[in-house]
């Protein structure tokens, strides 16, 4: 990620994914902070060894673990078992950009069974290589030359809910994540680890928190109106 632009990028994704969802007449919200247990390492500056005129304009850091004031960004928070709700436009028409030789946003969520739109703002050769979770197996491997500004990836690649890792064989430092889901009750933690999921019907649910570096954590929550939920992961 280009230094100085990270907070803005995280805030934009947080706002898009946290749009109000339609629920029952007794729907409330779940909000809180995803906290990091321990001392976070300083972000490393990655080596840019190809297409330096485009990729080397700004320093690129390893954003696999971003912690600010003890809060973890890019954690995906899902509420399991809640009924109703509507997917936001951002989740039904999910877009990822290749800009400055990084995937932007680093983590995004989409409605399972929809297409993923991948932009190429760099106007150089990229290839969109997707993998199931952290496996090295290939789901799709599609070249995106400089003249192809928009790539529409078939919904068959995202038919089932799950975590998809996105890499680029041309630029080996590029990494992104797409989480396909059947529930609209999901959010990505923003700057400082803050998240909010609106429109959640009252009830008892399981909350799943996933982070690319820190793994998965589940916990219970009783929702009644506006409910606070803080969680600590990692360490």
Across the structure, where does each feature detected by a protein language model lie?
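Extracytoplasmic copper-binding redox domains, predominantly the cupredoxin/blue-copper superfamily
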Residues: 26-235
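Sec/Tat signal peptide C-region and signal peptidase I cleavage site
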Residues: 19-27
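Bacterial N-terminal signal peptides that target proteins for export
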Residues: 2-14
């Amino acid at each position: 990620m280009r230094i100085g632009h990270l907070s803005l990028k995280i805030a934009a994704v947080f706002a898009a994914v946290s749009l109000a969802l339609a629920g029952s007449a007794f729907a409330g919200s779940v909000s809180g902070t995803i906290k990091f247990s321990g001392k976070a390492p300083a972000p490393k500056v990655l080596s840019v060894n190809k297409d330096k005129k485009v990729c080397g304009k700004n320093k690129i850091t390893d954003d696999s673990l971003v912690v600010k004031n003890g809060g973890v960004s890019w954690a995906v928070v899902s509420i399991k078992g809640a009924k109703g709700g509507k997917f936001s436009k951002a989740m039904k028409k999910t877009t990822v950009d290749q800009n400055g030789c990084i995937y932007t946003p680093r983590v995004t969520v989409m409605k399972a069974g929809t297409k993923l739109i991948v932009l190429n703002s760099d106007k150089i050769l990229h290839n969109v290589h997707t993998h199931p979770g952290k496996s090295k197996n290939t789901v799709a491997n599609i070249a995106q030359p400089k003249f192809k500004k928009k790539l529409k990836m078939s919904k068959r690649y995202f038919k089932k809910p799950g975590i998809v890792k996105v890499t680029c064989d041309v630029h080996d430092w590029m990494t992104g994540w797409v989480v396909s889901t059947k529930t609209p009750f999901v959010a990505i933690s923003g700057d400082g680890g803050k998240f909010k999921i609106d429109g959640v019907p009252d009830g008892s649910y399981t909350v799943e928190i996933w982070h690319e570096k820190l793994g998965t954590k589940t916990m219970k929550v009783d929702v009644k109106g506006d409910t606070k939920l803080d969680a600590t992961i990692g360490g």
